Amino acid sequence: MGTEEPARKFYTAPMTRYAEVAAFTTVPGQGNRAGVVLDAGELTGEQMQRLAAFLEAPETVFVTRLSDGLGRVRYFTPTQEVDFCGHATVALGRVLAQAGRWRGEALELETLAGRIPLRLVLDAGGGECRVWMHQPAFGTRAVGRGWHRELAEALGLSDRLLHRGLPLAAASTGLWSVFLPLLDASLLEGLEPDLPRIAELSRELGVVSVYAYAPVGVNRFAARDFAPLVGIPEDPVTGSAGGALLALLASEGRLPLRGNRASGLIYQGHALGTPGEIEVEVEVRGTRVEAVQVGGCAAVEREGVWPG
């Protein structure tokens, strides 16, 4: 008689649910893609990085804690962790609202860039929502004229096409970018970015991205944002940089004020076929930026499970 084989035990690792979201748009497939993971408290940083690479969204946000109006989050590109991401934060707000885990009560997120208060605005029917986020503190620094030609040429342009009446500078509301003003929005469509050179210039200037922008109205701008240094050849619609741009313009008196507030719109993503729209409000005292808020809509595209 043969011996009876003991019953086998099978162990499976817990699977992680995620959502893929289009931010700064109400149309799936447009705007800027973000991954959202609501229950990431048991994931290691290495697992978060692998999941972000798996999703291949420009950024993925992971919620490691959420209770009593306070959340703790981390942001990853497909190649590395970053301090903050605007469009992923808008996407997170949408997912929380759709899941019934946020109904507009006070909510703050702890990020590597500081605490970010969120505000939820529902439409009259309660279907669509707009997520507003307070940006981290605004900062700016000069970019010497010696860099102007190199930056323009890295985008395939002559420096004669730079707008001399708008600021060319580095600025941040969470992530540093260098902002390059162009004479006309039509120039954005014809950019020929040299991505290795842009990455090199970004490293030398201590920024995450090179952001080209042009006016299309008194307080409206079109833009493209290149971030190959952090694994994003072109970011479709960039909330953090959009906030920094409008804050930079307001600090230099280039936006109309109502009292001590300026507002504006940024259109981005058209060159990639994924248009989106960013709303920005800036509070200023003289030339000092006291607060920046960025808002937008988002649409959940799909949900899935990552087996790890």
From Swiss-Prot:
Keywords: Isomerase. The keyword Isomerase applies. It is an enzyme of class 5 (isomerase). GO terms for cellular component: cytoplasm. Its EC number is 5.1.-.-. The active site is at residue 59. InterPro entries: Phenazine_PhzF-like. GO terms for biological process: biosynthetic process. GO terms for molecular function: isomerase activity. Belongs to the PhzF family. PANTHER family: BIOSYNTHESIS PROTEIN, PUTATIVE-RELATED, PHENAZINE BIOSYNTHESIS PROTEIN. This is Uncharacterized isomerase DR_1330. It comes from Deinococcus radiodurans (strain ATCC 13939 / DSM 20539 / JCM 16871 / CCUG 27074 / LMG 4051 / NBRC 15346 / NCIMB 9279 / VKM B-1422 / R1).
